[in-house]
C-alpha cells in the first residue's frame, strides 16, 4: 500500500516517503531508532557502572567496593525507581544522533570502499573504529554531561544548564574532557565488535534455521562480540570516567592511569566492568539487530 509504514514491521514512516530517502539518511534513521530502544532499556546498567567508578574517586572508598546489586537497591531506595534512569536525557541526546551518525558513517564507508566484497577482519576493525571516532567526537560534550548526571555528584538542573556551567567554569576543554580515553575505549570497542560480529554471523548456520529466528541468531552473535569487545576496552572506560568526573584535576590520560594503578592496582581498571559489559553487550547486540531488521525492511543491505 502506498501509505503503509515500513519500520521494523510497524507503521512509522510512509513507504512512499521511505523510498525517496537517500540510503545514508535511511541508515541514520534506522540507527537512531535502534539507539533509542537500546538506550532506554539499558540506561540503569550505565548508571550503576558510573556510580561504581565514581566511588573510586572518593577518599573514603578506600578498601570498599560496592556491588552492582547493592547499588541498584540503594538507588531505588534513595532516589525511587526512576532514579535508575537518571541521566537518560543526555544519554538520549548523545545516543540517538550518535548511533545514527555511527551507522550512517559506517554505511557510507562500507559501500564506498567495499561495495563489491566483504571487508576482511582488519578492515572491519578499521571501519568500525573510524565510524565510531566520528560519532564519539561529535557527541562528547553530551557524554561528559551524561557521566556527571549519573555520578550523583553534580546538581545540574538541565542538559543545557550543565553544558553552560561546564563551559563557564572549565572552558571548551571541559566539554571535551576525556576525549583521548573515550576514543581509546569507543573506537577499539566498535572495531573489535564489528570484526567479531561479522565473523560470528558468517559462521552461524543461517541456512539451517527458520528466517523468523534470524534476529535471535544475530542477537546471539552480537552478545559474543560484545563480551569480547567490552573486556578489551574496560580499562579505557575507567580512565575516561575518572577524567570526566575530576574537573580540572587531570588533563593527561597517563596521569589518570598511573593514579588508578597506584591507588587501586590492576583491578582498579576493571571497576564497573560487569554492568558495563552487560550494558554495552546488550545495547550493541540490540542496536545491530534492530538496525539490520529495519534496513532489510527498507530494502537496503546493512
UniProtKB/Swiss-Prot annotation:
Belongs to the mitochondrial carrier (TC 2.A.29) family. SLC25A38 subfamily. It is a multi-pass membrane protein. This is Mitochondrial glycine transporter. Pfam families: Mito_carr. The lineage of its organism: Eukaryota, Metazoa, Chordata, Craniata, Vertebrata. Mitochondrial glycine transporter that imports glycine into the mitochondrial matrix. Plays an important role in providing glycine for the first enzymatic step in heme biosynthesis, the condensation of glycine with succinyl-CoA to produce 5-aminolevulinate (ALA) in the mitochondrial matrix. Required during erythropoiesis. It is found in: Mitochondrion inner membrane. The chain crosses the membrane at residues 28-53, 87-113, 125-150, 178-201, 217-243, 272-290. It comes from Xenopus laevis (African clawed frog). Solcar repeats lie at residues 22-112, 119-203, 213-297. HAMAP family: SLC25A38. One of its GO terms (biological process) is erythrocyte differentiation. Disulfide bonds: none annotated. The keyword 4Fe-4S does not apply. Its main location: mitochondrion. Keywords: Membrane, Mitochondrion, Mitochondrion inner membrane, Repeat, Transmembrane, Transmembrane helix, Transport.
Amino acid at each position: 500500500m502506498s501509505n503503509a509504514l515500513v519500520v521494523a514491521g510497524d507503521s512509522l514512516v510512509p513507504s512512499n516517503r521511505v523510498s525517496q530517502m537517500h540510503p545514508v539518511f535511511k541508515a541514520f534513521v534506522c540507527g537512531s531508532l535502534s539507539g533509542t530502544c537500546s538506550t532506554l532499556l539499558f540506561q540503569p546498567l550505565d548508571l550503576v557502572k558510573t556510580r561504581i567508578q565514581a566511588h573510586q574517586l572518593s577518599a573514603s572508598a578506600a578498601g570498599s567496593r560496592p556491588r552492582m546489586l547493592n547499588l541498584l537497591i540503594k538507588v531505588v531506595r534513595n532516589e525511587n525507581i526512576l532514579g535508575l534512569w537518571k541521566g537518560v536525557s543526555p544519554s538520549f541526546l548523545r545516543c540517538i544522533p550518535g548511533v545514527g551518525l555511527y551507522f550512517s558513517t559506517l554505511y557510507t564507508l562500507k559501500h564506498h570502499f567495499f561495495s563489491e566484497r566483504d571487508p576482511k577482519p582488519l578492515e572491519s576493525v578499521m571501519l568500525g573504529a573510524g565510524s565510531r571516532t566520528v560519532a564519539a567526537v561529535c557527541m562528547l560534550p553530551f557524554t561528559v554531561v551524561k557521566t556527571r548526571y549519573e555520578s550523583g555528584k553534580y546538581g545540574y538542573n538541565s542538559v543545557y544548564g550543565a553544558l553552560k556551567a561546564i563551559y563557564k567554569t572549565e572552558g571548551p576543554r571541559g566539554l571535551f574532557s576525556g576525549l583521548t580515553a573515550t576514543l581509546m575505549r569507543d573506537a577499539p570497542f566498535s572495531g573489535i565488535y564489528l570484526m567479531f560480529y561479522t565473523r560470528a554471523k558468517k559462521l552461524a548456520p543461517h541456512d539451517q534455521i527458520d528466517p523468523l529466528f534470524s534476529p535471535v541468531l544475530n542477537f546471539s552473535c552480537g552478545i559474543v562480540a560484545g563480551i569480547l569487545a567490552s573486556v578489551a576496552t574496560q580499562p579505557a572506560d575507567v580512565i575516561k570516567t575518572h577524567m570526566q568526573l575530576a574537573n580540572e584535576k587531570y588533563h593527561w590520560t597517563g596521569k589518570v592511569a598511573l593514579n588508578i594503578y597506584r591507588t587501586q592496582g590492576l583491578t582498579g581498571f576493571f571497576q564497573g566492568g560487569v554492568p558495563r559489559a552487560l550494558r554495552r553487550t546488550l545495547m550493541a547486540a540490540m542496536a545491530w539487530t534492530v538496525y539490520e531488521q529495519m534496513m532489510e525492511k527498507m530494502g537496503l543491505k546493512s
